[in-house]
Amino acid sequence: NFILSHVLSLGALALIVLFQPEIRRLLDQLGSSRLRSFNPFARTQQVTAIENAISQTVLACTEMSKSRTGVLIVFEREMALDDVARTGTIVDARVSSELLKNIFFVKAAMHDGAVIMRDGRLYAGGCMLPLSKNVNLSRDLGMRHRAGIGMSENSDAVVVIVSEETGTISVAIGGLLKRHLMPETLEKLLLNELIPQAPDEQREEKLHVRLWRLLTAGKGDKHDEI
C-alpha cells in the first residue's frame, strides 16, 4: 500500500507537470467566466467588441475579395493561441476594416501571415499557422487554405480565408472548410460561432469538466483534451 500510494502520487504529479500549460489556461478561463457572471457590464463590453470585430472583418473581406487580396484571419475561442501569436507581431488594437486592409496589402510586411483576433481585438498579425496534414484535401486548395484548415484542426478557432486567386471567401472550423460564402452568410456564421449563446454557468461547468478530464486522462489522450 505504501508503494502504491507513492506511485499514485508521483503519477498525479507527472500529469500536472505534463499538462501544466493546459491546466493554467483552463484555470484562467474559469476565473474569467466567474468574473463575467458577476460583472454583466464586462460581458456586454466583450460582446460589443466581438460584434464590431465581426462587422469590420466582413466589410474588409468583402472589399478584399473584390480585389483578390489574400486574407487569413483567426478568431480565437476557448483555446488560447499564444504560441501562434508569438510567431508574428503583437498589435492589440481595435479592429477596423482599414487596419485589416493595411495589414493584408500585398506590399505590407505582415500580409503573408495570419491575423489573430482575441476578445474582439486584433491581437497579432503576420502569424504562421500549422498546415493541414489531411491528404484528402482538394488539390485546388493553396497554402493559405491549408494553413487555415490546419489551424482549425489544431484548435477550436474559427478561421476566415479569402483566396488570392479567386477572391472566394471561406471559413474553416474543426478541420472542415465552408467555401463560396456571401458576405451576409459570413456575418451570420461568425455571429453564431463567436457570440456565446449559452449562460455563463453552463460555460463554467464545461470548463470544470475539461479540467477534470485533463487531470484524469493518460498521456496518450492529450490530443483529445485540447
Question: Whereabouts are the PLM-identified features?
Answer:
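Divalent-cation
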Residues: 14, 19-22, 26-226
